[in-house]
Amino acid sequence: MPTWCKTFLARAGIALVACLLAAGQTNAQTRPALVIAVNSVGSKLDPADTPLATELKIFGSIFDTLIKRDYAAEARDPGGGAILVPSLATSWKRINPRTLELQLRQGVKFHNGDELTADDVAFTFSPERIFGTNAMLPSARQFLRCLDPVEVVSRYTVRIRSCADDPTLELKLAHYSAAIVDKRAYLSLGQAGFKRAPIGTGPLEFVEWKSGDYIKFKAFDAYFGGRPTFQSVVFHEVPEAAARVAGLVSGEFDIITQVSPDQFSTIESNPDLQVLPSLLEQMQMLWVVATEPVVADRRIRQAMAISIDREKIVSTLWDGKTNSDNQFQLPTLGSVYDGARKGFQYSPARARDLLADAGYKGAQVTLRVIGNYYVNGETVAQAVQSMWQAVGLNTKLEIVENFTQAYAPGAAAVMGGCGFEYAAPESLGSCFFGDQALTRQRGFPKGIPGMEALAQQLATMDQSQRKQVFQKILDVFENEVPAIPLFRTPQFFAAKRSVHWQATPDFRMDLRPDNLSFATAAR
């Protein structure tokens, strides 16, 4: 509180309101004006509009979901599975295998002052917006699958129904595509207007967007999760990695994204800076184009998978700051995870035997990677090329400009990724099973043999049965080899040491008050 206020109150005991207002203004000014450098600010900020990773980083603190994952608690209990906690919903219960009833948090405000009600939830998941024939954003169905129209029980109670039995419904409601939007604002602005001037319930309130330059937000002090610890946040677009690091070193930026391992030493040599790592629930992998004659025999694909020394790649190219992965499961899957599973174990000798059994005669195996797209992408591809050549695979590496070139005829394998969008086997569907699975475009046009029937069996609510089914799915993966897992996809941020913030296992930057604080006052 300003000194003049203390003196005035001591002498007169009046003008309390004016003094408290002045104190509030002073406190607001002492909060930091946070500046974050990102490689891109993207072009849209609608959570259901298939956001890019760069857009996810920004809108993660604009919107909230009904349920959220407690990543901090999960970190304290690795292998314990996903931990779900209240967010915009204070509680929920299963009515039946298809239906959840949720109680909404009362008094929650959107940035425009509207109160969150059941009508906003119903609109968010409506046929008009996502699930109808002429929906605005049908692409969100790849994550949310199929939901019936929301039943509004009362102003603060809703029932959300899946179109079929769904043991993952709670997890889907914690997914970023399930973030709740303001019905009135959305319809007033239209989808095109809303995605450029978003209105949510989170701690970031939109102020200004200059395309290709920056997006500015101010603190939403009415945020239901507590008063934000910042005064404002600006996301600056800085495409060049070296420029982001230079800006952090100079003090221009507080946090930077997309830090590569070769920049660690520059940052860590400065006592005022820190590298902040996070492992995404995503795997860097190689898609295998099984329609290419040279890899049509599954034994050759199996040889490709077991001839890669993942530990060596992680230790030499990632400084040990990620995990090697030789199978498509993660501990966050909880009860369906099998920690004893061996996956694609490194065995060059066995790989050579498989190639001999398949009658491989030295045909060219073309590996493609998009240049300057994945951190360390070309270097990892070169390592894989060398390992394949070591077991006798005649491997040619091609660096291309885009995905169209990557999947042009001739590719036997292409570097890519696949993530657990939510902590359940079903979230692999967009990659490996279902009519829209990427594998249907990338080597298995009729689907992976045996996969679809197993995927349908995941709908059971019996967790032991789900585990058995999922482990059979992994058996199919290891037999057919539609893709070859390499390692967990890491993401690296860097920040001033005065910034106390933890990156999460998804792309969203969580700037809520329980995850962001500062050791010093604002500049």
Language-model region placement:
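N-terminal lobe/hinge region of extracytoplasmic solute-binding protein
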Residues: 37-96, 126, 197-200
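Structural transition elements
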Residues: 323-357, 371-378
